Swiss-Prot record:
NCBIfam families, sorted: PRK00290.1, prok_dnaK
Entry keyword Lipid metabolism: no
PROSITE patterns per record: HSP70_1, HSP70_2, HSP70_3
Family recorded in the similarity comment: Belongs to the heat shock protein 70 family.
Protein name: Chaperone protein DnaK
Alphabetical UniProt keywords: ATP-binding, Chaperone, Nucleotide-binding, Phosphoprotein, Stress response
Positions of the UniProt region annotated as Disordered: 470-504, 577-624
Induction comment from the UniProt entry of this chain: By stress conditions e.g. heat shock.
Keyword Phosphoprotein recorded: yes
Functional description taken from the UniProt entry: Acts as a chaperone.
Regions of compositional bias (Basic and acidic residues) in chain numbering: 481-504, 615-624
Coiled coil: none
Taxonomic classification: Bacteria, Bacillati, Bacillota, Bacilli, Lactobacillales
Superkingdom field: Bacteria
């Protein structure tokens, strides 16, 4: 097998590495740099990539930056002249450039690659990344998470067993914290958390805003609308940020930045590290949320962490390093170049695929929960977030109406308990279900997530063996903002969600109780005196009235009354018939109290009401 290169396709910068012997090595670009700006420009019919494109990013309107933030975003396109490009196509230009100079370095054709993505990338974004690789002529052998890749680079030659490692990854446009366990060649991700709209660009912007404000106060000129000035300010802000990682103060000089009534105007400013820390303190503190959540999701405290790894160029900022040290209670490991660790780790994974690296197993996780919509609009999870991948999970569901000929499977991703608040990944239909009473058909829904975090869903009628499958397409994925909003909303609306979930559960229980009680009364008709069933019938009528009036308090009260009446009837039937008929009668009215709950035995049915979930699948008219 030919060499498998490892690519860190970053928001701001990208890097590439390859395994030489047993060691990963960064491949420099034609300019001799170890990282390449993730910038694409169109000028005079020529496509420019990297440093040359970055230098004229603001002055040339046909320059695309940070395209990674739009990967997997449905309908998003960049218009250049009379042509439109998808994020996959723009990313492919970057990958093609990387592929070309990698081939020049290796002296052979490159066809295979491992590409990294932020840990919080969803299915759609991962699919889009694979598509970009295909467009660039690369066979993407594996998609792995950036923090996981950096841990691979750190742990390749480590012999310690059962190390728990926290990876703090602050890049140019994204931020992640991951907790991994390393031991005996196994790299297992325990949890991941992050903010996909936070990175070094935000720190640069704070310096730019400060310079613009000061210049406006001193000269009465607003530079924020001057494209030429903004390009120079952006470059100066990035340089000042980097300088302040090594010195306590830096001088910013931008002569002839603008012009006033008296002639040319020059920008001169001194920025101290203390002032920079003040301007960006809230950004640093914002990362603490993901830091704490990652530990909590892994069921750990900082005392359980053996090593802390800093990843991403923005972790060179002294205030960031100090904050992580204070939070973790230990000095971060500085043995890996934070700009290069991800690409190095990807190259190691490439070595695993090609067979050059032995005895390493990578176990990653899925960042968001996956499931389907069930009765009452509830989001029923089949795979929880932070589940190790690859994985597969099956669960039995049933129909919501008698003689229902088809089910519509609504696939969702998110953390909210109600389907309407989560993100639709796809829908598909399972048809030709034989006529049967509600709750009788057994529909097995299976979720499969492969090693790249890409989702496949199937639904199978266990009675007929008929099956329908779907692979979630990238056009239906989530944006970075939607992922962040999902978890934020889940925290802010926890109480509201709980109340809505309880209401839906009550309605489901009432509906099921009415259904089975009516069935029981019909089965006992003519077999027992009406005086024996009058209390049940009266309680049933009262519950149906409360349901019609949509009175939740009344529904709860009348449901309990009907359950008690049904229980009393079951006892009488048991006494009259020696137990056999009574047992059946008891199972009928009581079963609904447990109905509509997920079955956790992956399809085993013990005949009780709690063995399947009412799917509330949409009824399909076979004549349409």
């Amino acid at each position: 097998m030919s060499k498998v290169i490892g690519i860190d396709l970053g928001t701001t910068n990208s890097a590439v590495a390859v395994l030489e012997g047993k060691e990963p090595k960064i491949i420099t670009n034609p300019e001799g740099n170890r990282t390449t700006p993730s910038v694409v420009a169109f000028k005079n019919g020529e496509i420019q990539v990297g440093e040359v494109a970055k230098r004229q990013a603001i002055t040339n309107p046909n320059t695309i930056v940070s395209i990674k933030s739009h990967m997997g975003e449905e309908g998003y396109k960049v218009k250049v002249g009379d042509k439109e490009y998808t994020p996959q196509e723009i990313s492919a230009f970057i990958l093609q450039y990387i592929k070309k100079f990698s081939e020049d370095y290796l002296g052979e054709k490159v066809t295979d690659a491992v590409i990294t993505v932020p840990a919080y990338f969803n299915d759609a974004q991962r699919q889009a990344t694979k598509d970009a690789g295909k467009i660039a002529g690369l066979n993407v052998q594996r998609i792995i998470n950036e923090p996981t890749a950096s841990a691979l680079a750190y742990g390749l030659d480590k012999d310690e067993n059962d190390e728990k490692v926290l990876v703090y990854d602050l890049g140019g446009g994204t931020f992640d914290v991951s907790i991994l366990q390393l031991g005996d060649g196994v790299f297992q991700v325990l949890s991941t958390n992050g903010d996909t709209h936070l990175g070094g660009d935000d720190f640069d912007q704070r310096i730019m805003d400060w310079l613009i404000q000061n210049f406006k106060e001193e000269n009465g000129v607003d530079l924020s609308n001057d494209k030429m000035a903004l390009q120079r300010l952006k470059d100066a802000a990035e340089k000042a940020k980097k300088d302040l990682s090594g010195v306590s103060s830096t001088h910013i000089s931008l002569p002839f930045i603008s012009a006033g009534e008296a002639g040319p105007l020059h920008l001169e400013a001194d920025l101290t590290r203390a002032k920079f820390d003040e301007l960006t303190d809230d950004l640093v503190q914002k990362t603490k949320v993901a830091f704490d959540n990652a530990l909590s999701d892994a069921g750990l405290t900082v005392n359980d962490i053996d090593k802390v790894i800093l990843n991403g160029g923005s972790t060179r900022i002294p205030a960031v390093q100090k904050a992580v040290k204070d939070w973790a209670g230990k000095e971060p490991d500085h043995s890996i170049n934070p700009d290069e660790a991800v690409a190095l780790g990807a190259a190691i994974q490439g070595g695993v695929i090609s067979g050059d690296v032995k005895d390493i197993v990578l176990l990653d996780v899925t960042p968001l929960s996956l499931g389907i919509e069930t009765m009452g609009g509830v989001f029923t999870k089949l795979i929880d977030r932070n589940t190790t991948i690859p994985t597969s999970k099956s669960q039995i569901f049933s129909t919501a109406a008698d003689n229902q000929p088809a089910v519509d499977v609504h696939v969702l991703q998110g953390e909210r308990p109600m389907a309407a608040d989560d993100k639709t990944l796809g829908r598909f239909e399972l048809t030709d279900i034989p006529p049967a009473p509600r709750g009788v058909p057994q529909i097995q829904v299976t979720f499969d997530i492969d090693k790249n975090g890409i989702v496949n869903v199937s639904a199978k009628d266990m009675g007929t063996g008929k099956e329908q499958k779907i692979t979630i397409k990238s056009s239906s994925g989530l944006s970075d903002e939607e992922i962040k909003k999902m978890q934020k909303d889940a925290e802010e609306h926890a109480e509201e969600d709980k109340k809505r979930k309880e209401e839906v559960d009550l309605r489901n229980e009432v509906d099921q109780l009415i259904f089975t009680t009516e069935k029981t009364l019909k089965e006992t008709e003519g077999k027992v005196p009406e005086t024996e069933t009058k209390n049940v019938q009266d309680a049933l009528d009262a519950l149906k009235k409360a349901q019609k009036d949509n009175n939740l308090d009344e529904m709860k009260e009348k449901k309990e009354a009907l359950s008690k009446a049904a229980q009393d009837l079951a006892v009488k039937l048991y006494q009259q018939n020696g137990g056999a008929q009574g047992a059946a009668g008891q199972a009928g009215p009581q079963g609904p109290q447990n109905g509509g709950q997920p079955n956790n035995d992956n399809g085993s049915d013990n005949g009780q009401g709690g063995s399947t979930v009412d799917g509330d699948f949409h009824k399909v008219d076979p004549d349409k």
